[in-house]
Amino acid sequence: VEGREADVILEIPRDFAKSLGTGRPVELQISANSINGTKGGLGSSYLSTVVNDFVNQELGGTGMARLSVLNLYNPHLNYKVFMVPALLIMMLTLLCGFLPALNIVSEKEVGTIEQLNVTPLNKFVFILAKLVPYWIVGLVVLSIGLVLSAVLYGIVPSGSLWLIYFFSCIYILTMSGFGLIISNYSATMQQAMFVMFFFLMVFILMSGLFTPVRSMPDWAQWIAAFNPLTYFIQVMRMIFLKGCGLTDLWLQFGKMLCFMSVFAGVAVWSYRKTNA
C-alpha cells in the first residue's frame, strides 16, 4: 500500500493455520489506502464482506477469526481531507491560467504592445517580467488557502510546508507559461478566454481531481499522463496526507520540471516583437 502497488490488502499472520488447529483465535487485518476516503472505504468494505463470508462458511462463524480494518493516511475517511488540497490546486490553476492568458492579448487590443516592441527589451526578460507577478500572486493566494483550510476545516499538511511552496512555484510558472503561450497566439481577449477555458476543463477533468486516474479508460489515462495538473495533485495529496518528502516525489518533480521548462521556453519562443 505504501508503495502504491495495491490499494487494499489482507494481512494474515504466519501461524494462521496452526492457531486454528489449536483452537486459538487469530487476528486478521485489512489495510486500505484511504487518501480517497470513498474509494478506501468501499475497498475495505468489499474485502471485509469476502473475508466474513469465508469465515462463516469454513469456520462456522465461531469467532475464531477477528477482523480489523486500518484506514491508512485518512483514518476517519474524511472526504474533506481528500478534496481540500485538490481545491487549492484548482484555485491556483484557474488564477494562474486565465490571468496570464489575458495579459499580452489585452496589450495587443489597446496598442501598448507596439510601444514595448520598439524597445530593446529582450524577449526572455519580457516574458519573465510577465511571469513573476502571477508567481507572487499565486503564492499569496496559496498561503491564504492554506490558512483557511487550517482554520475552517482543521486540515494541515502532514509533510513539509516548504515542500508545498517549492512544488507550487514550479506549477505556477508552468500554468502561467501555458497562459502566455495562448496569449501570444490569440488576437482578442475573447479568443484567449475560450481557448484557455477549453484546456483548463481538460486539465481539471483529466487530472484525478474528482475521479482516480487508474479508474479512467485507457485514452483518458494517456491524456492524464501529459497533464501537469495530474502530478501536482499527486504531490499535494502525498504531502498533505502521507507526509512524503522530496525523496518520495522525484518522479513528479522531474515531470513537473519538464512541463515548466517546455511551457516557459515555448512562451519565450512564440512571442514575436513584430506583427509579421
Language-model-detected regions and their locations in the chain:
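Extracytoplasmic loops/domains of multi-pass membrane proteins
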Residues: 1-56
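Long, hydrophobic alpha-helical segments
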Residues: 83-102
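Short cytosolic juxtamembrane segments of multi-pass membrane proteins
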Residues: 269-276
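Short helix-capping/hinge motifs at transmembrane helix termini and TM-loop junctions
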Residues: 101, 105-106, 152-157, 186-187, ...
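Alpha-helical transmembrane segments and their short interhelical loops
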Residues: 123, 127-197, 201-204, 246-253, ...
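A cross-kingdom feature of multi-pass membrane systems that activates on extracytoplasmic/periplasmic
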Residues: 56-77
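Transmembrane helix boundary and interhelical loop/hinge segments in multi-pass membrane proteins
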Residues: 4, 97-119, 131, 276
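Membrane-interfacial helix-loop-helix junctions in multi-pass membrane proteins
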Residues: 73-77, 156, 208-262
